[in-house]
A protein has these predicted regions:
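Conserved core beta-strand positions within WD40 beta-propeller blades
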Residues: 92-94, 141-143, 185-186, 235-237, ...
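Structured core of small recognition/catalytic domains
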Residues: 96, 100-167
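Loop/turn-rich, solvent-exposed surfaces of beta-rich toroidal or solenoidal domains
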Residues: 274-311
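Repeated scaffold domains used in trafficking and secretory/extracellular systems
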Residues: 76-88, 123-140, 164-185, 210-232, ...
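Beta-propeller fold detector
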Residues: 65-74, 116-126, 160-168, 206-214, ...
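Beta-strand-rich domains and repeat architectures in extracellular enzymes and scaffolds
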Residues: 72-104
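Beta-rich interaction/scaffold domains
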Residues: 1-83, 115-127, 158-160
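Structural motif
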Residues: 99-111, 146-158, 183-204, 233-257, ...
Length: 315
């Protein structure tokens, strides 16, 4: 609310006037209405007026959390790409992509503060063998799987194979916590034996439990964040395509950093506010809420146009 704002003004004279239809002397206890710019002028000791100064408070007028998007003119050639995944890493956005008519995975990047200028698509050194959908950032490295082998990079250009990693088919989620890093930080994957495996340093891996029925393995996205009630514990949530072809809901599973098992979040009976099954669905965590969006889908018997809406949840 900027209709009643108390301000502090420093000048060589106590005679500061508020310019309006009828000028008035400003005092430090005045609350001023800054819904419109306010003008001041100073009366010097010589009793002469100086220049008129204008003060304005910039107010964010967009409705908060409305997720209004604006189109950025850029040299990103999206029409040449048939599949892609974006990853945030080291203040940059990396897009791992497969060009139309090709199988090779390439990467392009832009600064998080830019979005207009993108680097040219650079094929990964093992691009024809890589799975773009497994690209993930964890700690100070990027990761991707190629022919069941795990690779890492510090810059998206130079990659090295992690020889000690088991044969993997997908990366699931990770925690990179600032609150309790020694206990919470972990990278979770699924190996070729359909078992969960995890690492706390990228080199030493531990096999956990088998992947349960119904766990999503297609169009997988994840978020991790500290609990509001206990910041030393992190929650991981995974969202993906429902493996049941006739089901119209997306699948959500979760795990706490203090656990080593996953639990699902099935839609409650007669609850119509479920997350619909969308093609290539993705999930983000923003401002203590979850947001999901994706391609074409269906909900409550109606067809959903691709990328026509965000679906939000607090739990």
């Amino acid at each position: 609310n900027v209709s009643k704002v108390v301000v502090e003004i420093t000048a060589d004279t106590p005679y500061i006037l508020i310019v309006a239809d009828k000028d008035s002397l400003w005092t430090s206890s005045d609350s001023l209405n800054f819904e419109s710019p306010v003008k001041f002028k100073v009366l010097a000791q010589s009793m002469e007026y100086g220049a008129v100064y204008t003060a304005e408070i910039n107010v964010h007028k967009q409705e908060p959390d409305s997720l209004v998007w604006s189109n950025l003119s850029s040299d990103f050639n999206g029409s040449a790409i048939q599949a892609q995944k974006a990853v945030y890493f080291n203040d940059k956005i990396y897009v791992f992509a497969v060009r139309q008519g090709e199988e090779q995975v390439a990467v392009t990047t832009t600064s998080i503060t830019d979005g207009h200028s993108w680097s040219s698509l650079q094929p990964l050194p093992f691009g024809e063998k890589a799975d773009y959908s497994t690209a993930m950032a964890w700690g100070d490295h990027l990761y991707i799987i190629a022919e069941n082998q795990l690779y890492q990079s510090e810059n998206g250009t130079d990659w090295s194979k992690i020889e000690s990693a088991p044969a993997l088919k997908m990366l699931v989620s990770n925690i990179y916590s600032q609150n309790n890093p020694e206990k919470n930080n972990k990278l979770i994957a699924i190996n070729t034996n359909n078992m969960f495996v995890e690492t706390h340093n990228g080199t030493e891996w531990t096999e956990q439990k088998s992947v349960p029925y119904g766990f999503p393995e297609t169009s997988l996205s994840f978020v991790s964040y500290p609990l509001n009630t206990n910041s030393s514990i992190d929650r991981m949530l995974v969202l993906g395509e429902n493996p049941i072809a006739t089901d119209t809901t997306s699948v959500v599973w979760g795990q706490l950093s203090t656990e080593n098992t996953w639990g699902d979040y099935p839609p409650e009976k007669d609850n119509l506010d479920f997350c619909p099954k969308l093609a290539n669905i993705a999930m983000i965590h923003y401002n203590n809420q979850l947001y999901a969006f994706g391609g074409p889908g269906k909900k409550n018997g109606s067809n959903l146009a691709p990328f026509s809406a965000f679906y939000e949840s607090v739990n």
